[in-house]
Amino acid sequence: MRKIAAPGEQFLNAGHFWRCTLQEALNFSAGCAMVVTVNTSIPLEEPASGNISAERKPLEPCSIVIFGASGDLTARKLIPAFYHLCKDKQMPSAFRVIGFARRDKTDESWRNELREELNQFSRTQPVDDAVWKAFARNLFYCRGDLTDAAAYKKLEEMLTSFGSGPLRENLLFYLATQPSQFGEVIEQIHRAGLLHKDGAGWQRIVVEKPFGHDLASAQMLNRELTRYAHEHQVCRIDHYLGKETVQNILMFRFSNSVFERLWNRESVDHVQITVSEKIGVGDRGGYYEEAGALRDMVQNHMLQVLSLIAMEPPVSLAAESVRDEKVKLLKSIRALTPEDAARQVVRGQYFAGTINGQPVPGYRQEPKVKPDSNVETYVALQLLIDNWRWSGVPFYLRTGKNLPMSASEVRIQFRPTPHVLFAAQCGQHLDTNAIALRLQPNEGIYLRFNGKVPGMSLGVRPVRMHFSYDAEFGAYTPEAYERLLLEAIAGDATLFIRRDEVETAWQIVDSIRKGWDGKPLTNREFYAAGTWGPVASDDLLAQSGHVWHEPQMIK
């Protein structure tokens, strides 16, 4: 335990308990706080209590086909993920990875390109040449247009050349393409005899967000995805669900009785979920003009985190049990009328400002953005959950571009103590307890509570106990795609989004967007780049006597 300075936190004194004045106490201990941290020089003393994944059957040999393999996603995320799975000996005993794209390449030229890009995008450096060579022998390239039936016939012949067993029958199709092309690809692989609802082996389809742009388009997309496949064969990826700290939400809640018994309206005052980005839209202006922060972040990432934070305990860890509870939670969110949305939702857009001492342009000055655009780069909302556990507890969500820092954090703010003893002396200045789950960066969990400041006076101030992933387990943290690809091969759907989850989330988002149609942004909805959002966002919480808590950079 060590003393550190804690900027922005005020010293609190419990009045006249030991005949010391507040000013005396301030003079004695201003600027001093205590944070309990992990001593990284001490080795782990506690062995693992158990490994649930140890009961999983060995992964079956399979072939993975990446459609749109010449795009950034393959080089930046997919191939590095497969490489690290090989390095960690997590891949099946036999596998093949086929890249399908229009560009004219050979197996060898594609392998060489990927090797060069791995130098930039691998999370571990340097790249292990022995691991790469063993991995690269399983990389193949199939040139073809997504609409050309002959190209799929060529793909089928390539798969058949691997043998008649699992490498031909167990197939994972990764659609790294535009959503508008999903239907075409699925129909073509079905016609080529590669995709079946029932039959030998297994076939699965992996798709990336966006899963539509509203409820109607999402329903249409879901019909296309399940035209030739069962719902359990479809893996909808939200990379947030692959993050270690997001997965740890369920572990934190349901393997620790000390916290779960506080996780309800009796103890919790409100919950804040912040996903802030320090960067602007950059060269994604064209995409952002169609999406905006609500569709880009709230519909998927933020509602997924909310569902994990607030869901009821599942009856088991089986995929459908977990996903059932997430859907129940989303359906429990109180529907927003246009009048409700006007009170409970705030949008914003950044104008020119300064970040790290450097000037940055406003959203309307970004490339491919309309000069009079009303698209939101920031959104904050208050959601209410109508169930026994959370009735009356507001959940505040906010996300935005060009904010002061990039961070994702969930803060559980507990109710204040009764107005006696220390609370009676300090009044509203006595800090309330909180648990914060830091999803990124500096992943970890900290508990905020009040403690006595050392000294002759009875000084009270907030202190933190901090659990850091890096300090406790070392710097090894797999990328989200590594875990998600492994789960797709294994056929475990827990970390993938089910059809009804997608559609329920779109119902929430659509009800908000209806209230914005045709309405221009007001002055209180603009914010300078490098600040924490528009004034209207503070007004949203002030209605209930709450304030935003900015994520704190704890190392």
Feature-to-residue mapping (PLM):
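Secretory/organelle targeting and membrane-embedding segments
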Residues: 34-207, 211-555
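Cationic, amphipathic, low-complexity segments that mediate targeting or membrane/lipid association
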Residues: 6-9
